[in-house]
């Protein structure tokens, strides 16, 4: 069987320090030696319940906090609101609305332009295509036209 622990050391030091580790009573009020102990006791209670001082302290804290908040506000730039993706009625209109958006559409427009550039025929290919079309146009004029295969001769329609 496990031993039962009557005395715990858990959190004891925290408990001692919560109220401060106190000096012995004889040394507590060195500057007030020879003063009535009852008066000293009352003074302790007065310290605890000194509302006027507390209110002053709270007011000072509030001032300090507001000054700090203003300083932070001056340093930190306001955050921009993120633009939401515009919604259209249909998918096609959705896409158009997205492309037309001033910020969001930048990348989309760039991609579309790139795609168009890639699809466009190159200069050499253009020249080659022109040569081929010229050659094709010249070829049928010199060679007599042949009748296509599997065509039947026109027959007279019976009346």
Swiss-Prot record:
Basic residues bias spans: 1-26, 117-127
Q: Does the keyword Phosphoprotein apply?
A: yes
Q: Where is the composition biased (Low complexity)?
A: 134-149
Q: What is its main location?
A: cytoplasm
Report the residues modified as N6-methyllysine.
5
Q: Which GO terms describe its molecular function?
A: cadherin binding; heparin binding; RNA binding; structural constituent of ribosome
The alphabetized list of GO BP terms reads: cytoplasmic translation; embryo implantation; translation
Start and end residues of each stretch annotated as Disordered: 1-32, 117-159
* The UniProt record lists the keyword Cytoplasm: yes
- State the family named in the UniProt similarity comment for this chain: Belongs to the eukaryotic ribosomal protein eL29 family.
Name used for this protein in its record = Large ribosomal subunit protein eL29
Its lineage reads: Eukaryota, Metazoa, Chordata, Craniata, Vertebrata
């Amino acid at each position: 069987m496990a031993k039962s622990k009557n005395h715990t050391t858990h959190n004891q030091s925290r408990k001692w320090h919560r109220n401060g580790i106190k000096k012995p009573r004889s040394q507590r009020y060195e500057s007030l030696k020879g003063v009535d102990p009852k008066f000293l006791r009352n003074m302790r209670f007065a310290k605890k319940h000194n509302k006027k001082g507390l209110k002053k302290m709270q007011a000072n804290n509030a001032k300090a906090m507001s000054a700090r908040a203003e300083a932070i506000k001056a340093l930190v730039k306001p955050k921009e609101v993120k633009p939401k993706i515009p919604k259209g009625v249909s998918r096609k209109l959705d896409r158009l609305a997205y492309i037309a958006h001033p910020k969001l559409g930048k990348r989309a427009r760039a991609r579309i332009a790139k795609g168009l550039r890639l699809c466009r025929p190159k200069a050499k290919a253009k020249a080659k295509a022109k040569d081929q079309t010229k050659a094709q146009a010249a070829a049928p004029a010199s060679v007599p036209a042949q009748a296509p295969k599997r065509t039947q001769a026109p027959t007279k329609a019976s009346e």
